[in-house]
């Protein structure tokens, strides 16, 4: 479908725990915010059509819709599917077809809330790595203590174990992401570890530290502990996917716990309700910066195309954030800038 639009993104609307109602709701909100955005809804045509009807978009309306189209698929990648099985047997899945559309140049990015391992395997197979990159990684931004500043963290789940050289490459790519996308001059790169001392940690962590130290193009600042993830001591935090995923989900859980506990505390008595009403504007602003939904959307960095992974349990607000992240990366030409930077000084040895 040829359209006069500046941005085209393929959505795996069948992926995730919440189903098409959430992903399609987010899609409709996204196009209302950005008139030059075209979204291709990949998935079961009947289910998509029925879901769109809830938003007063009929099949007849869709035929002439300038911002939405359907790419029918016959399969769904389940959360329980093993990555290699999904890669071999789910070639007509909504996830695979969304990636194929990016590979074919019919879409500029793919967004999915589906099975992380399957998405990683399929994206790696379909889109291939940027030359010089051994392993792509999931990267996302997190809030820090300083207002309007955040920290990039990778890997968040794509690679359960990483050797020292892969961690080194993550540091290189994360540095490029922070510098090229956020405009940070000489981003501070740190390795997540069980302590700041040089003697702490496993051998592969120590070897990665040596490699990063030797690359003078990287502003490596040493080890950082989990308690300092939000301290603004680094612009990029590097770890393997197992540690990163556990750390991320723990942080999200704590943020929601604080939010719920605060609501309970401010409704415990009449006096508490009074103070709560007075402090409500300040707390609303605070929790807006802490809300995990706005940081939903981890990018598979290191690929030749843009792939954004939303959490499997994402609500409509969170999936919308993932779409917006994809839009931003398309506009800023992230893969091209990473490739250029790798070719001009940030060489992965």
Swiss-Prot record:
Please name the pathway: Lipid metabolism; phospholipid metabolism
Source domain of life is Bacteria
Catalytic reactions of this protein: a fatty acyl-[ACP] + phosphate = an acyl phosphate + holo-[ACP]
Record-level Gene Ontology MF annotations = phosphate:acyl-[acyl carrier protein] acyltransferase activity
Tell me which Gene Ontology terms the entry assigns under biological process: fatty acid biosynthetic process; phospholipid biosynthetic process
> Where mainly found?
cytoplasm
Q: Its Enzyme Commission number?
A: 2.3.1.274
Q: One of this protein's Pfam families, by short name?
A: FA_synthesis
According to its UniProt record, this protein's enzyme class is transferase
Keyword Ion transport part of the UniProt annotation: no
Subcellular localization is given as:
Cytoplasm
Q: Looking at the UniProt record for this protein, which Gene Ontology cellular component terms does it annotate, in alphabetical order? A: cytoplasm
Which terms are listed as keywords in the entry?
Answer: Cytoplasm, Lipid biosynthesis, Lipid metabolism, Phospholipid biosynthesis, Phospholipid metabolism, Transferase
Q: What is the recorded function of this protein according to its Swiss-Prot or TrEMBL entry? A: Catalyzes the reversible formation of acyl-phosphate (acyl-PO(4)) from acyl-[acyl-carrier-protein] (acyl-ACP). This enzyme utilizes acyl-ACP as fatty acyl donor, but not acyl-CoA.
Assembly notes? Homodimer. Probably interacts with PlsY.
Give the PANTHER family listed for this entry. FATTY ACID/PHOSPHOLIPID SYNTHESIS PROTEIN PLSX, PHOSPHATE ACYLTRANSFERASE
Task: State the family named in the UniProt similarity comment for this chain.
Answer: Belongs to the PlsX family.
* Name assigned to this protein: Phosphate acyltransferase
Q: Which organism is it from?
A: Colwellia psychrerythraea (strain 34H / ATCC BAA-681) (Vibrio psychroerythus)
């Amino acid at each position: 479908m040829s359209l006069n639009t500046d941005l085209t993104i393929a959505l795996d609307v069948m992926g995730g725990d919440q189903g098409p109602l959430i992903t399609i709701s987010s899609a409709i909100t996204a196009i209302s915010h950005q008139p030059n955005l075209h979204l291709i809804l990949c998935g079961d045509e009947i289910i998509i059509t029925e879901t769109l009807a809830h938003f007063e978009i009929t099949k007849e309306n869709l035929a002439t819709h300038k911002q939405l189209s359907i790419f029918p698929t016959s399969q769904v990648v389940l959360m329980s599917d093993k990555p290699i099985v999904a890669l071999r047997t789910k070639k007509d899945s909504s996830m695979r077809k969304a990636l194929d559309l990016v590979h074919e140049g019919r879409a500029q990015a793919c967004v999915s809330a589906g099975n992380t391992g399957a998405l990683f395997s399929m994206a790696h197979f379909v889109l291939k790595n940027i030359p010089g990159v051994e392993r792509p990684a999931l990267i996302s931004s997190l809030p820090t203590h300083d207002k309007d500043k955040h920290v990039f963290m990778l890997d968040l789940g794509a690679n359960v174990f990483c050797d020292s050289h892969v961690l080194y490459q993550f540091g290189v790519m994360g540095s490029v992401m922070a510098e090229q996308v956020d405009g940070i001059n000489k981003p501070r790169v740190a390795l997540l570890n069980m302590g700041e001392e040089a003697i702490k940690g496993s051998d592969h962590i120590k070897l990665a530290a040596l490699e990063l130290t030797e690359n003078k193009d990287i502003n490596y600042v040493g080890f950082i502990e989990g308690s300092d993830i939000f301290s603004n001591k680094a612009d990029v935090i590097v770890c393997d996917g197992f540690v990163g995923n556990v750390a991320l989900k723990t942080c999200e859980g704590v943020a929601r716990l604080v939010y719920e506990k605060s609501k309970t505390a401010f409704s415990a008595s009449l006096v508490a309700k009074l103070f709560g009403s007075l402090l409500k504007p300040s707390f609303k602003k605070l929790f807006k910066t802490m809300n995990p939904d706005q940081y939903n959307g981890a990018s598979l960095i290191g690929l030749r195309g843009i792939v954004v992974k939303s959490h499997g349990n994402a609500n409509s607000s969170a999936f919308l954030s993932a779409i917006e992240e994809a839009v931003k990366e398309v506009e800023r030409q992230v893969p091209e800038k990473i490739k250029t930077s790798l070719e001009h000084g940030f060489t992965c040895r």
